[in-house]
């Protein structure tokens, strides 16, 4: 699905080759500053490489309209984005931006259950904790139902027990819908449990890909 060949970005990363297959869960792990967040920004074309090539579904990413790409490849950042208004407003605004049909309240409640966010839909989003806002961002991404989900430490504000439940539920939903997940995680446990492929980064390089057979 994604392929990187001789990709360099400033002095941050240099990746000789990396292939991320479709309909799988790929976890990206490594020490702080190893280039993980830069890598996923390249995949979503938030930044462009200085040399080499990134392709998505066989096409150079630079030749794909950025808006169309980001509707197919949804990123959930570590610091959650929330908008003024209620939980319901925050869920529906993603569909509006993506020009997708609105859904009923039962569907909204369903995605909240998946991310274990037990709050009424009319709750003001400003009243949510950091961990609750992270779960709201995950729920909004699930509603959009893209081809690819990219998560950057999406549960860093959660305790380990809650994190396990949320990640398990979200990944189950993504796999049931035969979608692709690329996730930066600080948790070796999560990577080992859910990663069909694990890409290990160090000093801007992919030093190992586990699970590739």
Predicted regions and their residues:
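Catalytic Walker B motif of ABC-type/P-loop ATPase nucleotide-binding domains
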Residues: 149-153
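Helix-to-loop junction immediately C-terminal to a conserved catalytic motif
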Residues: 44
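Conserved ABC ATPase signature
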Residues: 124-128, 132
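Conserved catalytic motifs of ABC-family nucleotide-binding domains
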Residues: 80-89
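Helix N-cap at the start of a conserved alpha-helix in ABC-type nucleotide-binding domains
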Residues: 160-162
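Conserved ABC ATPase "signature" region
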Residues: 103-120
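Conserved ABC transporter NBD signature motif
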Residues: 52-60, 69
